[in-house]
């Protein structure tokens, strides 16, 4: 009887590919790792061999029971049966996050790990097209993420690496946390600014004269080629015009 795996997950089982991924993670024996999606425990087992402690979160009951049996003697692994979107990451502990995330939950999960965790490094296997969207500063997701993390591709993972085979290719990406570009006290204003900016609702943000001043100060000649740094400059002008700085 075929088991109904929640979220129609695609699993990495190829030993060579798993080892390539592990090599890219650059984990140390002192690292604490939180894994998103235990799956069948293939990656979990390898993570536990090279890190101090692995806490793996899995929502699907069948997979949780399967991996619990497989990993029950591994003292370095703690399994948690929970939705990652409901999971509370620790505030004071140092840790890294690793995970292969369901394609249709990519946006929710990446926001979760960036904005609701304190992980220094985050490694995610995502659909290739989604990775490109995280870099697109003409989209709200890209503008929000870039304030907290830098994003880079580490590995290409063709569809053939997964079972069952998905219709799209995937990539392993690394998100490295840096000092925030937008202080907490301005975050709500920034999210409002971004929502209007990406929809080109400039009149909701500036008067005509203010808009021209902001563009001039940011040295923007063409809005279609605006950079992330220029958008930050324009946001700072928005704060100044509204008496927030």
From Swiss-Prot:
<dbReference type="GO" id="GO:0046677">
    <property type="term" value="P:response to antibiotic"/>
</dbReference>
<feature type="binding site">
    <location>
        <position position="37"/>
    </location>
    <ligand>
        <name>S-adenosyl-L-methionine</name>
    </ligand>
</feature>
<feature type="binding site">
    <location>
        <position position="100"/>
    </location>
    <ligand>
        <name>S-adenosyl-L-methionine</name>
    </ligand>
</feature>
<keyword id="KW-0614">Plasmid</keyword>
<comment type="function">
    <text>This protein produces a dimethylation of the adenine residue at position 2085 in 23S rRNA, resulting in reduced affinity between ribosomes and macrolide-lincosamide-streptogramin B antibiotics.</text>
</comment>
<feature type="binding site">
    <location>
        <position position="10"/>
    </location>
    <ligand>
        <name>S-adenosyl-L-methionine</name>
    </ligand>
</feature>
<feature type="binding site">
    <location>
        <position position="83"/>
    </location>
    <ligand>
        <name>S-adenosyl-L-methionine</name>
    </ligand>
</feature>
<dbReference type="InterPro" id="IPR020596">
    <property type="entry name" value="rRNA_Ade_Mease_Trfase_CS"/>
</dbReference>
<dbReference type="InterPro" id="IPR001737">
    <property type="entry name" value="KsgA/Erm"/>
</dbReference>
<keyword id="KW-0808">Transferase</keyword>
<comment type="similarity">
    <text>Belongs to the class I-like SAM-binding methyltransferase superfamily. rRNA adenine N(6)-methyltransferase family.</text>
</comment>
<feature type="binding site">
    <location>
        <position position="58"/>
    </location>
    <ligand>
        <name>S-adenosyl-L-methionine</name>
    </ligand>
</feature>
<dbReference type="GO" id="GO:0005829">
    <property type="term" value="C:cytosol"/>
</dbReference>
<dbReference type="GO" id="GO:0052910">
    <property type="term" value="F:23S rRNA (adenine(2085)-N(6))-dimethyltransferase activity"/>
</dbReference>
<dbReference type="InterPro" id="IPR029063">
    <property type="entry name" value="SAM-dependent_MTases_sf"/>
</dbReference>
<keyword id="KW-0046">Antibiotic resistance</keyword>
<dbReference type="GO" id="GO:0000179">
    <property type="term" value="F:rRNA (adenine-N6,N6-)-dimethyltransferase activity"/>
</dbReference>
<dbReference type="Pfam" id="PF00398">
    <property type="entry name" value="RrnaAD"/>
</dbReference>
<keyword id="KW-0489">Methyltransferase</keyword>
<dbReference type="GO" id="GO:0003723">
    <property type="term" value="F:RNA binding"/>
</dbReference>
<feature type="binding site">
    <location>
        <position position="12"/>
    </location>
    <ligand>
        <name>S-adenosyl-L-methionine</name>
    </ligand>
</feature>
<keyword id="KW-0694">RNA-binding</keyword>
<dbReference type="InterPro" id="IPR020598">
    <property type="entry name" value="rRNA_Ade_methylase_Trfase_N"/>
</dbReference>
<keyword id="KW-0949">S-adenosyl-L-methionine</keyword>
<protein>
    <recommendedName>
        <fullName>rRNA adenine N-6-methyltransferase</fullName>
        <ecNumber>2.1.1.184</ecNumber>
    </recommendedName>
</protein>
<dbReference type="InterPro" id="IPR023165">
    <property type="entry name" value="rRNA_Ade_diMease-like_C"/>
</dbReference>
């Amino acid at each position: 009887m075929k088991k109904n795996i929640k979220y129609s997950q695609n699993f990495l089982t190829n030993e060579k590919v798993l080892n390539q991924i592990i090599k890219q993670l650059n984990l140390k024996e002192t690292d604490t790792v939180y894994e998103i999606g235990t799956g069948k425990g293939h990656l979990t087992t390898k993570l536990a061999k090279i890190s101090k402690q692995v806490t793996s979160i899995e929502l699907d009951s069948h997979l949780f029971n399967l991996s619990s049996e497989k990993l029950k003697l591994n003292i370095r692994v703690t399994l948690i049966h929970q939705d990652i979107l409901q999971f509370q990451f620790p505030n004071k502990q140092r840790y890294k996050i690793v995970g292969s995330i369901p394609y249709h939950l990519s946006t929710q999960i990446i926001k979760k790990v960036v904005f609701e965790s304190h992980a220094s490094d985050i490694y995610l296997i995502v659909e290739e097209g989604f990775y490109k969207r995280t870099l697109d500063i003409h989209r709200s997701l890209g503008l929000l993420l870039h304030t907290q993390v830098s994003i880079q591709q580490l590995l290409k993972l063709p569809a053939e690496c997964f079972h069952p085979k998905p219709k799209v290719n995937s990539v392993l990406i690394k998100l490295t946390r840096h000092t925030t570009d937008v202080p907490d006290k301005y975050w709500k204003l920034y999210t409002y600014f971004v929502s209007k900016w990406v929809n080109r609702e400039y009149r909701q943000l500036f008067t005509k004269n203010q808009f021209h001043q902001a563009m001039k100060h940011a040295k923007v000649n063409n809005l279609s080629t605006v950079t992330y740094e220029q958008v930050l400059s324009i946001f700072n002008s928005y704060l100044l015009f509204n008496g927030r700085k």
